[in-house]
Amino acid sequence: MLSIPWLGLFCLLLGNFIPGYLLTILWDADWMHDLAFSERLYIQLLIGVVFNSWLLLFLAELESFGLPAILLSWVLVCGSLMWIGRHHLQVPSLRQLWLSWKTVELIALLLLACILFAHPAESLLVFDDAAIYFLGGVQLAKTGSLFVRDPILASLSQEQGVQVLFTGPLGTGWSRYWGQFFIWDWIRPWVIFGLLHLQRLWCGLFTLFLGVYGGLWVAPVFGLLAVVGLYFLGRRLFTQEIGLLAAVLLTLNFVQIWLARLPLSEMLTQALFIGGFYLFTLWMQRRGMWLGIW
């Protein structure tokens, strides 16, 4: 039975929600006032995810990716936003989340998605894309850097390296391991993980707060966010019934269930794409300046 790191989970939720909440307050977002409480929560969480994606990339590029730097960044950013928007701050009340059929439908949808998605991969092929993302996230959480400083590589001359290394496909650099672990030059003894950085960043963040096994939960969480986003998008473009039907069909889709259990970038990409399309639709309807930027 796995123990849940409740403190880490609580900090992770706050760190992704509070920046989005404060940014919408700072912009005095009048276009949000008549939205349903659950829809406002989704927008604020989505903005928080976008903000943290840039923050995590910035810290990783500085090779400062770690709990102290992330927590300090959250405190500084949120503290600054609270001070700037201190005259507009309001504590959100859960009493606004009154039970209606729409709320019951959304809760039922989330429960269904949780049942289907909450079984992250238990085994990974080391040279497979899923393992590269996962191992890259664990390495990032451990070292704070996107690069691996390989002591064996540092001890080799270029002549020796040619004997023990092999070239990647299509001239993609030298490699000492199977999979997308590349060595681009001999000046810096770095092994660089292939594929996209963003998935690896979120895997590293979840690993820091939830432990090594927590890094596998990035895909299920963003799979849930994608389902909720499609629900609100369909509701805004068409009707409540169409939004619910689209979200249910996505949840029950075999490909969605499969990819929501693997630490790949598809769920993160899907959640951000649907979220961006939703915000664009909302902007077209309401013409909020800051909303258009997001």
Residue locations for each model-derived region?
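Membrane-embedded, hydrophobic transmembrane alpha-helices
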Residues: 1-100
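Transmembrane-helix motifs of polytopic, lipid-linked glycan transferases
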Residues: 18, 78-88, 205, 214-237, ...
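Transmembrane signal-anchor helices characteristic of membrane glycosylation enzymes that use polyprenol
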Residues: 102-127, 138, 142-145, 151, ...
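Alpha-helical transmembrane segments of multi-pass integral membrane proteins
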Residues: 8, 12, 43-44, 191, ...
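Interfacial juxtamembrane loops and adjacent helix segments
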Residues: 142-207
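Membrane-interface transmembrane helices that cradle and orient dolichyl/undecaprenyl
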Residues: 238, 276-292
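Short helix- or helix-capping micro-motifs
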Residues: 246-251, 278
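Short acidic/glycine- and proline-prone juxtamembrane loop motifs at membrane-interface regions
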Residues: 255-269
